[in-house]
Amino acid sequence: METVHVVAINPYRKGNKGKVFSYNIDTYDKVIESAAVKKMIQQIRGELPIDGVDLNDAQAVKKAQERLKSELPFFCPHYGMFKNNVRRQENAMPESFLFQTIIDVDDKEYVEKAIEKARELNCSSGIWNGSLLHLCYSARKKLHIGIRMPIGMTIEETQKAYCEALGVPYDESCITPERMIFLTDKDSEIYRSKMWCAVLPESEIQARRKAFLDRGLTVDGRGDAKVNSLQFTVNSLSLIHI
């Protein structure tokens, strides 16, 4: 059966930050492959000049680069659909939860080491085996690591555990259901699994939802858990065979 992908995305430059629309992966690809986005990324990184900005005025250049970054198209990695296309936490549709999250590496000096470490974790025998879904340079040439969440673990628990394994600081701003990520150009994409932004097989979705429900959470892992995540994950790894 062909894998279905769904992305909650605002594909427009200067798009309303409160609006996202559900498309398949083709729209995502058209955005990152566009000449316009490539030029914006080059300007943000200082590889191309910005029209009307004095290159000798460092403050003006920085301000213009920040403005351009804020104008980039963006997507939401945690959910494929938002009710009425409104990007708000309460509008994230539980049934569209993608069981994936994005780790931020904000230390430029650690980016290449983080790429190597992410690949190492992906091949390890622990809970991160097979977890790597996406590697991509951010607009500022830092790093976004897309990973599959271990069964039964919430976004917050996944972020904390993976950041510890990776050796980078945990950032609580990365765990909100409505989190948005600015898109970068195709050349910034280092690796993509075919399961990035994919709808999982129904049997796996049901097993993952049950894992959350058994912890006293919602089907998308929200709420106050009654069972420790590590204990539950260890006891539940046999539920899923990918």
Where does each model-flagged region fall?
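DNA replication initiation on ssDNA origins
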Residues: 1-99, 127
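DNA replication initiation modules
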Residues: 6-14, 82-109, 149-230, 235-239
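Long, compositionally biased, charged low-complexity segments
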Residues: 39-44, 60-69, 117-122, 204-216
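Short amphipathic alpha-helix segments
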Residues: 107-129
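Short, well-ordered alpha-helical packing segments
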Residues: 115, 119, 146, 159-163
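Short beta-strand
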Residues: 133-140, 171-176
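A generic structural motif
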Residues: 141-148
